[in-house]
Every structure is written in structure tokens, then in C-alpha cells.
């Protein structure tokens, strides 16, 4: 290894400041550090060691939280700069490879702390399912995620096509959609177009929950002029002059 970079971060303090959970805080600071090093060494990819088991754990976590179908795809092999070269390899096979080649794996001790949701799924839930219901649960869940990913890709393509049909104006700080055409769409497309629009405007749709989406659909359906919603900090949705205004105020 040519260079090694490390950094000590007070995750608990970060979580408190951002008002998020410890697990999410740990993930955020980790990837912020990866991005920092990536820029420092002029790299264009960040390789992380997620494996097939991690993917299944993520699917189960998202299912327990009531995720939409996007979340049930699990971890993807590539997300922007992030690549996951061993995402299709089971943890057991990785451990066997290390053993056969006299490689000492670096194990995070916190992985055994079952107070964390992911660890409880990894150490308790999945072994229980394997023992009591389906010894091939990993492969079963992977097949499910592949079906979902295929259907989700189709829906995403459809959403992009419908979005272009109802798009009136797209600026840095606001997007305007045709109200009449939006109201004529099926509900599932309305929901996805709302998320797609917010994502285009703000670089992501974090913080936009099911209740916010339903409120926006209701606002558009009732078509009461000059009514607006603020579903998230810095985001305003306004219905006016037969248009839907998505306004980024940050």
C-alpha cells in the first residue's frame, strides 16, 4: 500500500449536531472522509467492500422501515463515484479466501454490537431465518432485488418521459410543471414525478416522506389558487395559474 489515510471523528457529537441517528452519522462522516481523500489524491473512484450479505441486510432494513421499491433493490454496484467490486460475493466466500491466502481481515468490533439495527439483522435475524425458514435466504433476497431493480429501471424511464411532457420550465431555483397534465397521470407516476422533480431541483429527495407527497398530490387535485406547501426546509410547492411551482429557497 502506497499511502494510508486516517481521521478521528466524534460521531456522537456529529449525530447530535445533525439530529440524526448514530448509524446514519457514522455512514455520513465515513463517506465525507472518503470524498476528502479522493479529492486529495485526484482519484475518480472510491472502492468500498460491501458484499452480497450487506446488500441483503440493507434490503431487510428498508423493508422494515416501509421503503418503496427503490429501497428494496439494496446496495448498487455503482453509485456515482462509489464502486463496490465484491457486492456479488458472499461474506463466507470472502472469509474463506482470506483464510486460504493467509490474509488477516480487519474486523470492526462494533459489528458485534446488536444494539445497532444492521448488526441485529446480520447477527440475529438472518441466522434465524436461515435456521427456521430458508437456508438460501441470501440468494432468495438477491433474486428479489434483481426483479425489483429491473422493474424500477422501467418505471424510472417512464417517469423521465412523462416529466418531459409536463415540464414547462426548469431553472436552478425552480421547476414549473403543467397542472392539468400532472393531474391526468396515474397516482404512481405522480408520486415518482414529485420525487424526481425535487431531486432535480435539490440534488436529492431526502426528507420528502409519503405524507408530503400525498399532500402535494391533494394540493394539485384541489387546484386552489395561491395555495402552497412547505414539505421540507427550503422547499416550497405552489399551485398557481394552472402551474405547479417547485421552488428551492435555500
Question: For the regions a protein language model found, what residue spans apply to each?
Answer:
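Secondary-structure boundary/capping positions in well-ordered alpha/beta enzyme cores
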Residues: 3, 41-44, 136, 201-205
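AMP-forming adenylation/ATP pyrophosphatase catalytic core
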Residues: 9, 29, 77-79, 123, ...
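Mid-to-C-terminal catalytic subdomains of enzymes
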Residues: 101-146, 150, 235, 241, ...
Amino acid at each position: 500500500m502506497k499511502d494510508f489515510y486516517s481521521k478521528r471523528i466524534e460521531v456522537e457529537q456529529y449525530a447530535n449536531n445533525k439530529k440524526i441517528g448514530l448509524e446514519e452519522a457514522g455512514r455520513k462522516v465515513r463517506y465525507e472522509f472518503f470524498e476528502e481523500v479522493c479529492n486529495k489524491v485526484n482519484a475518480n473512484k472510491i472502492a468500498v467492500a460491501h458484499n452480497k450479505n450487506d446488500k441483503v441486510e440493507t434490503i431487510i432494513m428498508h423493508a422494515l422501515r416501509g421503503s418503496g421499491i427503490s429501497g428494496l433493490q439494496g446496495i448498487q454496484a455503482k453509485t456515482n463515484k462509489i464502486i463496490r467490486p465484491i457486492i456479488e460475493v458472499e461474506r463466507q466466500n470472502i472469509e474463506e479466501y482470506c483464510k486460504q491466502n493467509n490474509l488477516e481481515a480487519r474486523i470492526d468490533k462494533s459489528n458485534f454490537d446488536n444494539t445497532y439495527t444492521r448488526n441485529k439483522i446480520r447477527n440475529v435475524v438472518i441466522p434465524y431465518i436461515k435456521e427456521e425458514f430458508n437456508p438460501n435466504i441470501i440468494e432468495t433476497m438477491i433474486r428479489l432485488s434483481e426483479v425489483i431493480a429491473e422493474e424500477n429501471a422501467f418505471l424510472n424511464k417512464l417517469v423521465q418521459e412523462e416529466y418531459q411532457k409536463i415540464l414547462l420550465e426548469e431553472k436552478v431555483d425552480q421547476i414549473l410543471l403543467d397542472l392539468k397534465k400532472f393531474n391526468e397521470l396515474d397516482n404512481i407516476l405522480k408520486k415518482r414525478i414529485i420525487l424526481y422533480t425535487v431531486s432535480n431541483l435539490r440534488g436529492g429527495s431526502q426528507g420528502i416522506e409519503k405524507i408530503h407527497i400525498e399532500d402535494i398530490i391533494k394540493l394539485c387535485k384541489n387546484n386552489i389558487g395561491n395555495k402552497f406547501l412547505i414539505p421540507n426546509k427550503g422547499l416550497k410547492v405552489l399551485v398557481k395559474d394552472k402551474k405547479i411551482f417547485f421552488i428551492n429557497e435555500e
